[in-house]
Swiss-Prot record:
Superkingdom to which the source organism belongs: Eukaryota
Zinc finger (RING-type): 29-70
Name of the protein in question: E3 ubiquitin-protein ligase TRIM39
Oligomeric and partner information: Isoform 1 interacts with MOAP1. Isoform 1 and isoform 2 interact with CDKN1A. Isoform 2 interacts (via domain B box-type) with CACTIN.
Keyword Cell division listed: no
Gene: TRIM39
Length: 518
């Protein structure tokens, strides 16, 4: 077989060489025996170099013979043969290639063409090498066959490279589109932020108007009491001034006249003004009267202190107003959902705390529970007592050092019996932890989450109308992941405490009030 291959290779090489040699002959001038230069054709059909045939006929005036066939023509007729000129150029190029191949493809030992390929030594050899002792027992095939075989092998290697190239091309195309997508996302987020703050401003304006209205009402109330108090004090002052003038007049009287009706004078003024009874007071002398006047002045001072009392009341009313940030806190508090766990949905292996804020997994069921339509019987989870069909809601779940858990929401129509795959397509939007350090959003396929700081507490924010469910690491106040979808059913907060794996995952999941609002 090797000999047959050698013969076939030799025949193929000889045939190629003969064809090239014939082309060189046809492209040569019969006069100068070189490649035709500016080839021209004469009447008999032969071709020559223009310069050669011109010199050949130089001394002739008629009967111009052909240098090849000797046929004569009456006229010096030379027609350029441009097509032949192109073939001459091709022949020159082929000869140059042949020369280069011959120089590069010669056996260094025998100086013969390397026309064969040895499989054992994986090298090109010449005919002499192939029949020599070195390669006699080897498998030798024509170089063209080996070339074709290895081309096919390389083609197979090329296929995955082309696939990878296409993948990179698609990736590059995708990356080139991302700036535009990013611009759209940024604009969408910008509009969302503007809407959020417009809503916040609206709420703040409403709260501001309420507070200003309360302040104005409080001001008017205090002013009214101040006016009433001022009028009351004016009346008291006039009465006291009248009494003082009367007493002063008595003091100017003689002793008998002064003491004659002082008792009636004092009793008709002082009890009516101050509510006290002086029927038992019998001033004996001028010194006693002066003591009464001093007492009257002291009472006047006590009454005028009501101004100070109103002022303190004013301060007290102002201190009852919210602090500058109270309105914002009040608005934010409206987003906080009071989430409690629903025992009617709890898997039989789950135990809830008395306040229905904590849930943990137990391996042995403590009691038999009725298999109601709302209860999960395969997936060990529990839902909240209240679901959401609109609005924005926020709650936090303490996960502590647990090694396995999942939190999120599910729609009302999810399957609660039998085996299920909790994915968005089946109505579940969750973030989970398993094996202690593997976090993922349960998309299709799962989206790995690279969390730098292990969360002790997870915050969940649902914006029903916007179709977003966001998760936050409360421990370092970082964003974990956001689902974007279209919500069409009631959504229920979902809690999966994970299968108990020793003491590490024995702790419960606990719903906690947000840290900033405790």
């Amino acid at each position: 077989m090797a000999e047959t291959s050698l013969l076939e290779a030799g025949a193929s090489a000889a045939s190629t060489a003969a064809a090239l040699e014939n082309l060189q002959v046809e492209a040569s001038c019969s006069v100068c025996l070189e490649y035709l230069k500016e080839p021209v054709i004469i009447e008999c059909g032969h071709n020559f170099c223009k310069a050669c045939i011109t010199r050949w006929w130089e001394d002739l005036e008629r009967d111009f013979p052909c240098p090849v066939c000797r046929k004569t023509s009456r006229y010096r007729s030379l027609r350029p043969n441009r097509q032949l000129g192109s073939m001459v150029e091709i022949a020159k190029q082929l000869q140059a290639v042949k020369r280069k191949i011959r120089d590069e493809s010669l056996c260094p030992q025998h100086h013969e063409a390397l026309s064969l390929f040895c499989y054992e030594d994986q090298e090109a050899v010449c005919l002499i090498c192939a029949i020599s002792h070195t390669h006699r027992a080897h498998t030798v095939v024509p170089l063209d066959d080996a070339t074709q075989e290895y081309k096919e092998k390389l083609q197979k290697c090329l296929e995955p490279l082309e696939q990878k190239l296409q993948e990179i091309t698609r990736c590059k195309s995708s990356e080139e589109k991302k700036p535009g997508e990013l611009k759209r996302l940024v604009e969408s987020r910008r509009q969302q932020i503007l809407r959020e703050f417009e809503e916040l401003h609206r709420r703040l304006d409403e709260e501001q108007q309420v507070l200003l209205s309360r302040l104005e009402e409080e001001e008017q109330d205090i002013l009214q009491r101040l006016r009433e108090n001022a009028a009351h004090l004016g009346d008291k002052r006039r009465d006291l001034a009248h009494l003082a003038a009367e007493v002063e007049g008595k003091c100017l009287q003689s002793g008998f006249e002064m003491l004659k009706d002082v008792k009636s004078t004092l009793e008709k003024n002082i009890p009516r003004k101050f509510g006290g009874s002086l029927s038992t007071i019998c001033p004996r002398d001028h010194k006693a009267l002066l003591g009464l006047v001093k007492e009257i002045n002291r009472c006047e001072k006590v009454k005028t202190m009501e101004v100070t009392s109103v002022s303190i009341e004013l301060e007290k009313n102002f201190s009852n107003f919210p602090r500058q940030y109270f309105a914002l806190r009040k608005i934010l508090k409206q987003l906080i959902a009071d989430v409690t766990l629903d025992p009617e949905t709890a898997h039989p292996n789950l135990v809830l705390s008395e306040d229905r804020k904590s849930v943990k997994f137990v391996e042995t069921r403590l009691r038999d529970l009725p298999d109601t339509p709302r209860r999960f019987t395969f997936y060990p989870c529990v839902l909240a007592t209240e679901g959401f069909t609109s609005g924005r809601h926020y709650w936090e779940v303490e996960v502590g050092d647990k090694t396995h858990w999942a939190v999120g929401v599910c729609r009302d129509s999810v399957s609660r019996k039998g085996e299920l795959t909790p994915l968005p397509e089946t109505g579940y939007w969750r973030v989970r932890l398993w094996n202690g350090d593997k976090y993922a959003a349960t998309t299709t396929p799962f989206t790995p989450l690279h969390i730098k700081v292990k969360p002790k507490r997870v915050g969940i924010f649902l914006d029903y109308e916007a179709g977003t469910l966001s998760f936050y690491n409360v421990t370092d106040r970082s964003h974990i992941y956001t689902f974007t979808d279209t919500f069409t059913e009631k959504l229920w907060p979902l809690f999966y405490p994970g299968i108990r794996a020793g003491r590490k995952n024995a702790a419960p999941l606990t719903i906690r009030p947000p840290t900033d609002w405790e």
